[in-house]
Structures are given as C-alpha cells and as structure tokens.
C-alpha cells in the first residue's frame, strides 16, 4: 500500500508546495511558541534563527486566555522547572493580536518559511483563518476535545496533531473526527513533560502510530535530560529520525537564561543549526535503508499510553467541562452554558 502523505499547498509565492511522509524529506518545525515574550522584534530574531538553521517552518501559539483556563487565580499554579507559575496571569500576559501575528507571518514567508500556529479557542482559530495560514496545529491538550477537533477540521486546512499523554484509543477517536472532513493530517509523538528523562522518550511509538493509522508521523521534542540533570539535544532526535519520523518539531530560544516559561528547555541557535543538519542527514540515511546506530535508552516499549511522567501535565492541561452559567435541573447542556477549558490546579 502506498504510504499516505500530507500535502501543503502554500498561498505565498515565496514558498514551495510540501509533501510530508513517504519518501519525502523531513518537515522541520521551529516551535517559537511563547518564547517571543510578547516582543515582535524578539519574534523576528527567532524566525531568523530558524531560517539560518535550515528549518522549513515556524510555529507559534495564539489564544485568548478565557478560552484556555478558568478566570483568575482559580486556574491555580503550574509547576515547571522548579517554579510555581500563576498560569492564568502568565497566559494573559502573552496574548497576541492579529497585527502581531500578521507581521510575523509576512516576515517568515519573506524568508521562505511556512508560518502556522496552535490556536486555542474559536477567536484564535478565526485569526489564523483570517491570516490564511497554510496549516494548523492541534496541541496534545486538545486531543480529547472532540468539538474543537471538529471545528479545526471544518476549515479543511492540513492538520498536524500532537498526541502527548494520550491513549491509543483517544488518538483514534480524534482522527475519526478529522476524517469526517478530510484526511490531510499528520500525527506527532511527544512526551508532555518539560523536559523528560531520556528513558521516558518511548520513540518506538512513532512506528506504533504509523502501523495503527497509516499516516505521516513525526516527533515533537519538548526537551530531554539525563538523570544527572544534563540536557541532551542529540540522542532523542537522532533516534527519532533513525526510526522514521517524518516531521520534527523543536522549541527554540535565543538564550535559555532569558525570562519566559519555555525558555529553559528550548534549543539555542547554534544547537539548533547542528541539530537540524544532523536529523536531515539521519533522515537521508533512513530513506537509503542504511544501518543507523542509536542509543537504546530512548526507544522504549512502543506502547501508546499515558506515561507516569505525563500524568501531572495531563491532569492540569487536558480539557475538562466547566459551567459558565448557573445550570438548573432539567436544563440542556450546550456551548451556551458550558465550556471546555484546561483543568488547572
């Protein structure tokens, strides 16, 4: 059976059409995410770093905080890299406007980079549609939120969907919702622990997902470290490429010492350039059926389940149903009186 591919047809004349999967080159994503810190010039410098490293695309996150967490301090604090962060306030400070994204999209496309985002909420998705982005990302935390998945699929844009923390049956349900509209989709294996230990990478899941769903599968790298605490930027991406990943996503920063929630586990420009060169070379060897040595520590069992190290983030950030109005006995539940939000603390 001929492998399915995800096809992206760009609107910008500065971009070439892309096919992901099969015998095609690796599709590389520089995840800028929230690391722009609300500063458009910092965002441009990160796009420059992605371009200089040889990435094919840059990805952001956009949202209105009310569509992500319950309002104010009720959302609680999130533990990351030894700090307890007031999560609602953090997101509120990182909301970005249409003009901010529009300028960065134009800047990226002028450099020949695809630009897209992981939207959170209807207004965020509308912003991307108004920008006419060429593809959309569905974050791991949305994979059980079937109404949202339908909403994204209705746009008929190509979708890259992460499935960190999910069980195989949850991935199956989410894909079936997308298939009601189209099949132009790729999956991303990731571990929702920031950063995780190398032995928690379980990269064999890449092949588990390929076998189960027969669509392109990639690896979203949220950072890995040794038990000593030392960050490792080489072992996991090399092994993922050797196992046949078709998309590679990595968080980037100009400096891990910068302020910002995700800076501390992100990849700096010099590391990024070396990493992208390395994974592309490994991808070429894989396509040529060459023997590739990998460190067995990050291969894992290949069983797709919620890992022990993912349970905290899954409980905090996967979507739950909240009432947004007083609901009386006998009232019908609808999006007028309930909302899907991250659970929080």
List the predicted regions and their residue ranges:
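Catalytic cores and adjacent flexible loops of soluble metabolic enzymes
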Residues: 1-345
């Amino acid at each position: 059976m001929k492998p399915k591919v995800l096809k992206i047809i760009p609107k910008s004349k500065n971009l070439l059409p892309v096919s992901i999967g099969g015998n095609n080159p690796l599709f590389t994503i520089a995840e800028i995410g929230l690391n722009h810190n609300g500063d458009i010039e910092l965002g441009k410098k990160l796009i420059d770093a992605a371009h200089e490293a040889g990435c094919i695309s840059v990805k952001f996150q956009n949202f209105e905080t009310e569509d992500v967490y319950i309002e104010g301090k009720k959302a609680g604090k999130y533990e990351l890299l030894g700090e307890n962060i007031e999560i609602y306030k953090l997101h509120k400070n990182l909301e970005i406007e249409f003009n901010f994204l529009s300028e960065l999209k134009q800047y990226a496309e002028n450099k020949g980079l695809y630009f897209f985002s992981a939207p959170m909420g209807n207004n965020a998705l509308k912003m991307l549609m108004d920008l006419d982005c060429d593809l959309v990302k569905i974050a791991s935390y949305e994979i059980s939120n079937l109404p949202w998945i339908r909403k994204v699929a209705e746009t008929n844009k190509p979708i890259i969907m992460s499935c960190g923390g999910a069980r195989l049956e949850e991935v199956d349900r989410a894909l079936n919702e997308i298939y009601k509209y189209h099949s132009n989709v790729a999956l991303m294996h990731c571990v929702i622990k920031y950063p995780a230990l190398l032995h928690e990478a379980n990269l064999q899941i890449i092949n588990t997902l390929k076998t189960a769903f027969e669509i392109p599968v990639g690896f979203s790298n949220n950072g890995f470290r040794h038990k000593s605490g030392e960050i490792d930027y080489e072992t996991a991406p090399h092994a993922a490429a050797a196992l046949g990943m078709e998309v590679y996503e990595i968080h980037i920063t100009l400096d891990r010492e910068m302020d910002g929630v995700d800076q501390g586990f992100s990849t700096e420009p010099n590391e990024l350039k070396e990493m992208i060169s390395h994974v592309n070379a490994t991808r070429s060897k894989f396509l040529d059926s060459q023997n590739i040595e990998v460190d067995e520590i990050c291969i894992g069992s290949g069983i797709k389940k919620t890992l022990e190290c993912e349970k905290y983030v899954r409980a905090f950030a996967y979507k739950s149903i909240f009432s947004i109005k007083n609901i009386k006995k006998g009232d019908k539940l609808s999006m007028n009186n309930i909302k899907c939000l991250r659970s929080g603390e």
